């Protein structure tokens, strides 16, 4: 009896082996949990280091600083460019106003666009060229100016569509301001035959209806 008590209860077969297997099974799970915890603890540091690397890549190098310096230089020079552009526009506007003032019978308060001024100036130059007896050169003049007649601003304004289309053909409005080539030749023949009568007519006829009434 004493030997049996000292020895203790007999061990059941297979019980110790099952306990060791259970411990062996539990150990990998514990290792997995520990590895997960370690990963979660290390992840923020890894993310920070990765973000630091990404930030270091995104930071501009010497080229970026050079580009930034160029941008600053351009922004500093932009007021000078704006002032230069304003002076250019002012000079161009003054030139067009001077050209408009040189056109005959254009009131000073008449508002004409730049295209209007150019069309009227071209038509007036064509009229003067024909008056002097010179033919308009074909290749030197644009096609729409070859048949252009003198456009009177007071007759054409404010009909802008007729301002550009009236010079291409002979319209009723042009008949009062310009004469056909046959009429010009007839007038020249009459003037050469009776120069005294023509001078008398020019001296007696008033310049305008308003002056004639006076």
Swiss-Prot record:
UniProt xrefs under SUPFAM superfamilies: HLH, helix-loop-helix DNA-binding domain
Recorded GO MF terms: DNA-binding transcription factor activity, RNA polymerase II-specific; protein dimerization activity; RNA polymerase II transcription regulatory region sequence-specific DNA binding; RNA polymerase II-specific DNA-binding transcription factor binding; transcription regulator inhibitor activity
Annotated Pfam families: HLH
Transmembrane segments annotated in the record for this chain: none
Keyword Transmembrane helix listed: no
Tissue: Expressed in liver, kidney and spleen.
Gene Ontology cellular component list: chromatin; euchromatin; nucleus
Ranges of biased composition (kind: Polar residues): 174-183
InterPro entries reported in the protein's UniProt record: bHLH_dom, E-box_TF_Regulators, HLH_DNA-bd_sf
GO terms for biological process, alphabetical: cell differentiation; decidualization; developmental process; muscle organ development; negative regulation of muscle cell differentiation; negative regulation of transcription by RNA polymerase II; positive regulation of gene expression; regulation of transcription by RNA polymerase II
Keywords: Developmental protein, Differentiation, Myogenesis, Nucleus
Compositional bias ranges of the Basic and acidic residues kind: 40-49
Region (Disordered): 1-86, 174-214
Domain bHLH: start-end pairs: 76-128
SMART domains: HLH
Domain notes: Both the bHLH region and the C-terminal portion are essential for inhibitory function.
Assembly description: Forms inactive heterodimeric complexes with TCF3.
Protein's job: Inhibits E-box-mediated binding and transactivation of bHLH factors. Inhibitory effect is similar to that of ID proteins. Inhibits the formation of TCF3 and MYOD1 homodimers and heterodimers. Lacks DNA binding activity. Seems to play a role in the inhibition of myogenesis.
Protein name (database record): Transcription factor 23
Originating organism: Homo sapiens
Gene that specifies this protein: TCF23
């Amino acid at each position: 009896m004493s030997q049996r008590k000292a020895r203790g209860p007999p061990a059941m077969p297979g019980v110790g082996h099952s306990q060791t297997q259970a411990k062996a099974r539990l150990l990998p799970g514990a290792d997995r949990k520990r590895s997960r915890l370690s990963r979660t603890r290390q992840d923020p540091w890894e993310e920070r280091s990765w973000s630091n690397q990404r930030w270091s890549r995104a930071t501009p190098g010497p080229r970026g600083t050079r580009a930034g310096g160029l941008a600053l230089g351009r922004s500093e020079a932009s007021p000078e460019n704006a002032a230069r552009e304003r002076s250019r526009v002012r000079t161009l506007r003054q030139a067009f106003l001077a050209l408009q003032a040189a056109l005959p019978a254009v009131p000073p308060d008449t508002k004409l666009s730049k295209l209007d001024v150019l069309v009227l100036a071209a038509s007036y130059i064509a009229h003067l060229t024909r008056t002097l007896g010179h033919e308009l050169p074909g290749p030197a003049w644009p096609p729409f100016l070859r048949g252009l007649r003198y456009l009177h601003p007071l007759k054409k304004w404010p009909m802008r569509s007729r301002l550009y289309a009236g010079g291409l053909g002979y319209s009723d409005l042009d008949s009062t301001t310009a004469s056909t080539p046959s009429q010009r030749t007839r007038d020249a023949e009459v003037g050469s035959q009776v120069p005294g009568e023509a001078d008398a007519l020019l001296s007696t006829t008033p310049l305008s209806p308003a002056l004639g009434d006076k």
